[in-house]
Amino acid sequence: DAAGTFPRLIDMGVNADILGAALTVAMAQRLVRRLCPNCRVATPLTAEHHAILDPLLKNIPHKDELPANLETMWLPKGCEKCGGLGYKGRIACVEVVLMDREIEACVRTTSSERDIWAAAKHQQIRRMAQDGAVKVLQGVTSLIELSRVVDLHDEVMLETIA
């Protein structure tokens, strides 16, 4: 994840005291397949889907970007335009941590990702899994595809968004 960039650089021998001057932003991304807009199929969310998505959406920053309907997601079907796959193209699920005074101070004293995420709380960062969950509800990708690429049950991630 993006906060893990700082401990990894320190582990590689970069001096923690210069990270603040050397970095402006840390970003992590995973590419997910984009649902084919010609053949995707709407389906209601089940209790199992809610069990996965609800913790991600509970405290999500920028709620205004969520679709009005939070009870529907989309599945791949397959057609001539997508070669029968149900997917056509890719899109990134991202998370970005800006280097600011709080992050710089945190990195100088600890290399704990939990502490870095706590220091970044004021930035209202949408975690990669949360960005993907929004894309699932918008019909951009499927929950199956998102869970293939992003760990939706990551303990640190779930703890830091709670």
Predicted regions and their residues:
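Short, flexible helix-loop junctions that flank or precede catalytic/ligand sites
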Residues: 1-162
